[in-house]
């Protein structure tokens, strides 16, 4: 069992739940091998001391292995160690299961896992509204959906592939959505990024109706094909586009948040939680606390060994400078507000935007000529909507661009101590 859909960034397998490429500024190429658990402890302590501590989010991912017992025990140990670091009054506000945990872990394993989570972090009734189980390899049975609901999961995310025959896929998905609605799942999410943009996808979308439609749909990148073919299929049943291939129903809380400016951007993508501390549990997981990222050991044997020694399995990470935090804030503005609030940034950061971002401003002026952006008195409006265009604009503000990006030719990457060769994926 495991998560085969992780993405490779600079030789590191990035967890599939982490938003690529705009969620992990400035990419794992900025990660350093001299960042360790002591640095992570310092950032957690700083976060605990904030007048209004950040919301807490935990996601869990597993690794491919024959015997899950060592992995299950190790992940439980990591949960307890992480929970002990954070102040006891900081409620866990979102929980996400990824990898194959929701699909293939046994009923006893899942019950034990949830018990460990609740013993490690404070959980209240409100936070249970944000428990999400992600399933990626198969559409779960009714019994599995019922178990997840009993355990407290209120959101279910189906990440479909084209492995099943077209007709069977549409019928099975419709049955699963109906069952999830009957069981009381509050949010049903359909992630189609691994579906090829062909007639199978179009027919699948057209098979949805008011009784079987999910609450959110993530569409794939459609390449050279006309995205209108796919957009029309979902818009016909009431979905609205917000950006980065996300379509929402108008009664979705994300839609209201997007309209009133309270939808935020995090390492995990769009969220109603503002600037949360994200704790990744499991082999190869990445955490984001304050201005730092930390990376867990990925080989399962090394991950388990460190936890048996009573150590967090952190093997690297990055600490962002103030300029990095400024750039990350601009990227979030682009993706959530379709604008760059220049006046607000100048007041908050004490900069003159066009001088501080002289090179970036030149590139934005070039995009004005193609009507992708436009200047106004106090800011810059973003008119681009497609994923490639939005990513191109975000990359303008990457001071430490990832390998192969459009910005890589303009700015050299920062120097750092490389990660252990045993970690890097060739």
What are these model-derived regions, one by one?
Residues 1-59, 63-65, 73-78, 82, ...:
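Flexible, acidic/Gly-rich N-terminal and inter-domain linker regions that tether
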Residues 69-83, 94, 98-122, 126-354, ...:
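C-terminal scaffold of the Radical SAM
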Residues 368-378:
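A short, conserved structural fragment
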Residues 352-366:
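Short amphipathic alpha-helical interaction segments
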């Amino acid at each position: 069992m495991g998560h085969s859909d992780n993405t490779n960034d600079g030789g590191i397998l990035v967890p599939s739940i982490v938003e690529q490429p705009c969620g992990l500024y400035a990419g794992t190429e900025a990660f350093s091998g001299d960042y360790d658990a002591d640095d992570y402890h310092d950032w957690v302590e700083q976060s605990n001391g904030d007048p209004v501590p950040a919301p807490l989010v935990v996601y869990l991912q597993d690794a491919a292995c024959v015997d899950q017992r060592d992995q299950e025990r190790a992940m439980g140990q990591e949960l307890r160690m992480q929970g002990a670091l954070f102040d006891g009054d900081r409620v866990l506000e979102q929980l996400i299961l990824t990898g194959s945990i929701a699909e293939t872990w046994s009923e006893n394993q899942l019950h034990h896992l949830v018990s460990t989570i609740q013993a490690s972090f404070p959980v209240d009734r409100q936070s249970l509204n944000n428990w999400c189980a992600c399933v990626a390899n198969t559409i779960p049975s009714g019994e599995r959906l019922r178990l997840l609901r009993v355990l407290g999961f209120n959101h279910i995310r189906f990440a479909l592939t084209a492995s099943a025959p077209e007709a069977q896929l549409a019928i099975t998905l419709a049955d699963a959505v109906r069952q999830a609605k009957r069981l009381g799942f509050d949010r049903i999410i359909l992630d189609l990024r691994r579906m090829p943009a062909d007639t199978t996808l179009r027919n699948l979308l057209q098979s949805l109706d008011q009784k079987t439609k999910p609450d959110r749909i993530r569409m794939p990148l459609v390449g050279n094909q006309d995205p209108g073919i796919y957009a029309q299929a979902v818009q016909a049943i009431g979905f609205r586009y917000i950006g980065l291939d996300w379509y929402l129903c108008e009664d979705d809380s994300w839609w209201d948040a997007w309209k009133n400016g309270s939808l935020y951007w995090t390492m995990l993508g769009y969220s109603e939680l503002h600037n949360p501390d994200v704790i990744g549990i499991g082999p190869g997981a990445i955490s984001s606390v304050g201005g730092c990222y930390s990376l867990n050991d990925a080989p399962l044997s090394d991950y388990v060994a460190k936890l048996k020694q009573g150590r967090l399995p952190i093997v690297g990470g990055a600490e962002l400078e103030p300029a990095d935090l400024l750039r990350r804030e601009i990227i979030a503005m682009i993706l959530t507000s379709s604008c760059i609030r220049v006046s607000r940034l100048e007041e908050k950061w004490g900069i003159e935007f066009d001088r501080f971002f002289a090179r970036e401003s030149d590139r934005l002026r070039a995009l004005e000529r193609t009507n992708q952006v436009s200047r106004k008195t106090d800011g810059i409006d973003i008119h681009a909507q497609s994923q490639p265009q939005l990513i191109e604009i975000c990359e303008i503000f990457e001071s430490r661009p990832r390998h192969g990006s459009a910005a890589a030719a303009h700015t050299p990457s920062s120097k750092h101590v490389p990660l252990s060769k045993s970690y890097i994926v060739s």
